[in-house]
Amino acid sequence: MSSRYDRAVTIFSPDGHLLQVEYAQEAVRKGSTAVGVRGANCVVLGVEKKSVAQLQEDRKVRKICMLDNHVVMAFAGLTADARIMINRAQVECQSHRLNVEDPVTLEYITRFIAQLKQKYTQSNGRRPFGISCLIGGFDADGSAHLFQTEPSGIFYEYKANATGRSAKVVREFFEKSYREEEVANEHGAVKLAIRALLEVAQSGQNNLEVAIMENGKPLKMLDTDVITDYVKIIEKEKEEELEKKKQKK
């Protein structure tokens, strides 16, 4: 039955679904996990990178990209689709800065990306973007924001969220572990993001990519050694938690 309605993006199935959009969401669910945490004075984005083939040149295919000096984006899904979206968003940020003489707000650029995605769900001869985006950064007033957009064109703001493979598991982890006091500083926000990735990372700490954005400062990508230090702290805390549980029993 579904094959009658999934050949065109503009045709609804009898039960009210746009099957091509749902297929795009499935492409996101098969993508590498991406997480975002909004702290009191920073925004942290983290992704799990795919392992590089043995004979492949280890060129960096970053899943965390700058859209403007104050806006950073991570994504899950089809990398080629993300490349097009990133280029469009970067041009829009530059155009806005030239025309209005002010940088874009986080909601403005998120809405632009969401509207572009939505257009591709109503146009013949096109297909939806197979990516979900986590967009973080700071507005001119210094307030931090973290948004997520879906292939359907909807977007929401979050304190912490995840997308991609095992996103549901990570969201449940955030719901249990996110505390305002825990992310009051950069250290706590980074630790929470890395711990969330470790919950689902198939290759452990080896292929994690973490970026920190602070207001008025350039984006900072964490070195592998720094991530390893955080992992050691997290493992030590887990051991202490297990020890406390054993003592209670």
Swiss-Prot record:
Gene3D superfamilies: Glutamine Phosphoribosylpyrophosphate, subunit 1, domain 1
One cellular component (GO) term of this entry: proteasome complex
Keywords: Cytoplasm, Nucleus, Phosphoprotein, Proteasome
One Pfam family linked to the record: Proteasome
Gene Ontology biological process terms, A to Z: proteasome-mediated ubiquitin-dependent protein catabolic process
Localization (cell): Cytoplasm; Nucleus
Major subcellular location class: cytoplasm
Residues modified to Phosphoserine: S177
Protein family per UniProt: Belongs to the peptidase T1A family.
Function: The proteasome is a multicatalytic proteinase complex which is characterized by its ability to cleave peptides with Arg, Phe, Tyr, Leu, and Glu adjacent to the leaving group at neutral or slightly basic pH. The proteasome has an ATP-dependent proteolytic activity.
Entry protein name: Proteasome subunit alpha type-7-1
